[in-house]
């Protein structure tokens, strides 16, 4: 997280308005490290969310944020120095309801590159990407925020819902490709560069039909947690 906060500090300084107008909220999701202490030392607002579900974490941060524009990013990412400038310009056109920056991975291999290539056609087709995801607060609240019933895929559902309400005002999703975030390869480091092909795709049908399987996968993949088997 320190690398993320360093990159946010640079991007705040680049913004044309007062840097202090950009509030940084860090959600402490039952961490066992120094997440909260580091964030507070850096002047961030810290909120605790015990529920280990990414949608709940993001909604918890949005609930205490005071800004009219909301931006969401993972703690192991780094944002581009021009991020806030690009977001402000994009939303100021009035033609954009929400968007994302996309990511450039911090390292590459054949497995990571093929995984990236597999998903890119869907990204191009839908304009839904990862990295820094942003929208107006009023639109976020209009759709009810992130869907907390979902164990994963909450970011896709959020952008899908925002695109739906944007159509009413002739607004669209956008991808800010010139300000890509630097994405962490932590999951590839942990599970292997080919794990999407060897593990995840095989589990997908089961997860789509079984809420318990989805919950168990989310606990293991994002939190490294094994549930106690039911007796």
Positions of the model-derived regions?
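Hydrophobic helical membrane-anchoring modules
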Residues: 164-231
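A conserved acidic beta->alpha catalytic loop
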Residues: 7, 28-36, 77
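Acidic donor-binding/catalytic loop of UDP-sugar-dependent glycosyltransferases
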Residues: 34, 73-90, 160
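Short, well-formed alpha-helical segments that are part of the catalytic scaffolds
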Residues: 1-16
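A short, conserved alpha-helix in the catalytic core of glycosyltransferases
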Residues: 139-142, 149-170, 174-176
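Glycine-rich, basic loop-to-helix element that forms the pyrophosphate-binding segment
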Residues: 49-65
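Short aromatic/hydrophobic "clamp" motif used to bind/position activated sugar donors
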Residues: 70
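Conserved donor NDP-sugar-binding/catalytic core segment of glycosyltransferases
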Residues: 81-111
């Amino acid at each position: 997280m320190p690398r993320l906060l360093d990159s946010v500090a640079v991007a705040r300084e680049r913004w044309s308005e007062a840097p202090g107008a950009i509030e940084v909220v860090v959600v402490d999701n039952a961490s066992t490290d120094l997440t909260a202490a580091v964030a507070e030392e850096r002047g961030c607002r810290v909120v605790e969310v015990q529920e280990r579900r990414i949608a709940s974490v993001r909604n918890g941060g949005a609930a205490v944020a005071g800004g009219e524009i909301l931006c969401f990013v993972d703690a192991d990412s780094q944002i581009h120095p021009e991020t806030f400038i690009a977001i402000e310009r994009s939303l100021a056109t009035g033609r954009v309801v929400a968007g994302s920056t996309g990511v450039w991975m911090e390292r590459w291999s054949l497995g990571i590159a093929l995984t990236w290539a597999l998903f890119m056609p869907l990204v191009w087709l839908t304009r839904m990407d990862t990295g820094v995801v942003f929208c107006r607060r009023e639109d976020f609240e209009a759709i009810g925020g992130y869907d907390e019933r979902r164990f994963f895929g909450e970011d896709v559902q959020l952008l899908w819902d925002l695109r739906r309400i944007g159509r009413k005002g002739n607004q669209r999703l956008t991808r800010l490709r010139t300000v890509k975030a630097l994405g962490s390869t932590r999951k590839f480091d942990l599970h292997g560069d080919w794990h999407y092909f060897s593990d995840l795709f095989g589990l997908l049908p089961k997860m789509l039909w079984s809420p318990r399987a989805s919950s168990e996968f989310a606990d293991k993949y994002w939190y490294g947690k094994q549930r106690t088997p039911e007796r």
